[in-house]
Amino acid sequence: MVWGLDMVGPLRKGPGVFTHLLIAVDKFTMWIEAKPITNIRSEEAVKLFLDIIYRFGVPNCIITDHGTNFTRKKFLDFSDGYSIRID
């Protein structure tokens, strides 16, 4: 199972002061998961992928654009802990 992960934003502030969208796409089924977020820290990506793991299972690989929020220690430790390759 391979997922793509990207961040969209900044957006105009709406209800709840959300400024970005975190988007994950299953590359086989093209299923989309989107989560509005208020900050772009790597913790938000970890939370989204924990939810994905609980519902769909552990992916083999996550494809990112290597943005700083996806290359920080917290996200890399999370992916190492689940043996997820980051491309």
Task: Please tell me what each predicted stretch does.
Residues M1-D87:
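Retroviral integrase
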